[in-house]
Amino acid sequence: MLNLYLCQPNFRFGIAGKTGYWIPYSIGCLWSYASQFDDIKDNVELKDIIFRRENVDTLVDRLEDPDIIAFSCYMWNWEWSKEVAKRVKERYPKCKIVFGGPQVTDRPKEEEFFKHHPYVDTISLAEGELSFTDILRNLMNGKLIEKIYNYPRLTDLEIPSPYLTGVFEKIIADNPGVLWNGTLETNRGCPFACTFCDWGGLTYSKLKKFPEEKVLQELHWMAHNKMDYVTIADANFGVFTDRDMKFTEELVALQKEFGYPQVVDATWYKNSSEEIMEIVKNVISSGVNRGLTPSTHRQ
């Protein structure tokens, strides 16, 4: 059995004397996808999901014989992730270190990456579900892993949800006093190529939709689990007007029934229209209005 740790420390924030964290959505997606397969579920044990920027020494000391540690790297956790990875490799030289996420994807010359980060065993570019699953299988079977994984995009998005498959149940149960922020994807990709933006490496790419029923179920999960703040992570929310109106109507209904989410944030479709403005007005008039405002300017 391989011992797996997943790391995606995000911002900590405070509201009314309580501490809040973002649910580590990206890294959760990798595990919900990989663990749907029996061979991985039977041979890999998820030991912990690390969502806090813990003291490096304390974190390394509490690891239990790690075989694999995967990091979802962003600009706000980049330095921390590198230091943790370096220290883990010093303590556990056989442990495989996997880096992915936008901060890795943005590296201009991947071949040079390992010269500057020799403690990293492999990096995954762009979407990570397929490559992460392949990495786990190779390690399970005693095969060598590649230095760089850059797989094509998923052909469809009918994939397991980290919310609905229980990936986050343990960290929520173990941290009862924490306010959680959630991330929601209704689609992936972006047809534009704005000079200032790189939407996870998927700019100027075909839009692919998550199943509508899955999105609605995730919204219910977030309301029931009292996600105070929800970010809709689409590059162009509102591009599918009728579908996205249905999602906002569900958000309004859930907020009225359960009081959550209290804040919703979205990046809106470039080509604003009266229909999209109706979506905005629909939510603002409901009281879910502290974050759901149009951000439509693209260049």
What are these regions (language model features)?
Residues 1-224:
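Acidic, low-complexity intrinsically disordered segments
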Residues 22, 163-299:
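Radical SAM [4Fe-4S] cluster-binding motif and immediate context
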